[in-house]
Amino acid sequence: MNPAHLLVLLAVCVSLLGASTIPPLPLNLVQFSNMIKCTIPGSRPLLDYADYGCYCGAGGSGTPVDELDRCCQTHDNCYSQAKKHPACKSPLDSPYIKIYSYTCSGGSLTCRDDNDECGAFICNCDRTAAICFAGAPYNKENYNIDTKKHCK
């Protein structure tokens, strides 16, 4: 890719992070999605988990509706910790855009040693959540729920 295009893309990403009224979309969603596919082969993370319970997807509030939703709440909390982590001070270290390296082998995830401290922290947030998802039942009745009613 042309370096000028990369700079424009980076500028757009940084400006999105600075927009206080618009929550940033996780730009490393592909990595997290692939981690989930590693622990749950055949799953469709972007479809199945983007609007599940009170915490899976954008935002989150109230009491989690089940074990899977608690996995998402824990993941949200981990990202909040990452934003405050001393090694994650740069806007480029946001958990929503930070790229890290990991391996998937036989359903087992490993965050690689070549990650910097911030990347390792965020990788472990995603790894822990993917493992949690794999151990939690998926209840279809908790997909696309009325969050105003169920997430108080």
UniProtKB/Swiss-Prot annotation:
Known cofactor(s): Ca(2+)
Disulfide partners: C38-C104, C54-C151, C56-C72, C71-C132, C78-C125, C88-C118, C111-C123
Pfam families referenced in this protein's UniProt entry, alphabetically: Phospholip_A2_1 (PF00068)
Reactions mediated catalytically: a 1,2-diacyl-sn-glycero-3-phosphocholine + H2O = a 1-acyl-sn-glycero-3-phosphocholine + a fatty acid + H(+)
Signal peptide annotation: 1-21
Alphabetical UniProt keywords: Calcium, Disulfide bond, Hydrolase, Lipid degradation, Lipid metabolism, Metal-binding, Secreted, Signal
Cellular-component GO terms for this entry: extracellular region
Biological processes, Gene Ontology terms: arachidonate secretion; fatty acid biosynthetic process; lipid catabolic process; phospholipid metabolic process; positive regulation of fibroblast proliferation
Co-factor: note: Binds 1 Ca(2+) ion per subunit.
Homology family: Belongs to the phospholipase A2 family. Group I subfamily.
Protein's UniProt name: Phospholipase A2 GL16-1
